[in-house]
Amino acid sequence: MSEQIRLPEDLHDKVARFPEYSFGAHRVCVILKDGRFFEDVIIGGGEVVKVGGSTKIPFTQDEIADVINRA
């Protein structure tokens, strides 16, 4: 499995305000700066830990523009 990536610092507080999806994890949609988006992203401990059923995280920290709650 791919390494986890840190969520940009400016989005940590936003995600922390979302309801938990499961045991401290948050389910979000990640929006990238180029307009692409990824549903079913799991954030835990300020890190992207899973993207859908993928074994890789298909974006980098620098590409993340925003997150939307999907809990």
Each predicted region: which residue ranges?
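Motif-centric detector for short Cys/His coordination patterns
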Residues: 1-71
